[in-house]
Amino acid sequence: MRILSWNVNGLRAVYKKGFVEAVARMDPDILCLQETKLQEDQRSQEMINFDTYQSFWDYASTRKGYSGVAVYARKRPLANRCGFGVERFDAEGRVIELDYGRFVLFNIYFPNGQKDDERLHYKLDFYRDFFSYADALKDQGRSLIITGDFNTAHNEIDLKNPQSNKDRSGFLRIERDVLDDIISRGYVDSFRYLYPDTVKYSWWSYRFNARKNNAGWRIDYFFVSEDLMAEKVVQDAFILNEIAGSDHCPVGIELDF
């Protein structure tokens, strides 16, 4: 099974930049999208009934053209839900949960901390409350796959210019500590686990020819519960730098299912 995650930075925009062809090339069984920036009535029929996939959507109720996540899946899950039961976070349309029995998949657009203390606290609170929810499932023996745009680069290897960005949200020590804590609680960064020394990025600013110069950040992840690595269910993890259309590129994992 191949699962991909891609922050498209506007689904309508990326449809005009070769989205259909890119998905055909990547051929995922499940495709998780972040920052769709859509309301329910803004979806085209092509978006709803894309190829052979079933689609699942979550939208921001706080304002239009903001946030939003979607999942395209070839196989219908046993159950699905939006959000995780905390209204201040669920209102921004950031989470889809799909239960496939063997594993539970979360597609998440984690908040951006920005330069604003209020949004940084919101981001940190989101991390805390979501992973408390995830921990409860894991404690019940569920295998978890948590993917999406985490909006944080974990270590210096995960961005081109760590020193000049150490005071910028996305690489603040307090944000990086959260990822340390997630790992200590039994979640594995699948790409870094399999490729400890590989330098690859998943996001580049639109400014300063950042993508051309590969001045990027790795902020898109597949975190999985430890059992999926220990049992070698996760066969590979990868970053598809060659896929254009957004300021992010897709990331993915291959599972032995």
Task: State each model region's role.
Residues 1-50, 57, 61-69, 82, ...:
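N-terminal, active-site-proximal structural segment of metallo-dependent hydrolase catalytic domains
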Residues 7, 23-41, 105, 134-156, ...:
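Active-site beta-strand/loop signature of hydrolases that rely on acidic residues for catalysis
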Residues 12, 40-42, 64-65, 114-117, ...:
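Short catalytic/ligand-binding loop motif for oxyanion handling, primarily in non-cytosolic enzymes
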Residues 30, 51-54, 126-215, 219:
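Metal-dependent phosphoesterases centered on the DNase I-like endonuclease/exonuclease/phosphatase
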Residues 37-39, 45-113:
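Structured beta-strand-rich core segments of catalytic domains in phosphoester-bond hydrolases
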Residues 64-80, 198, 210-231:
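Conserved beta strand-loop-helix elements of the APE1-like EEP
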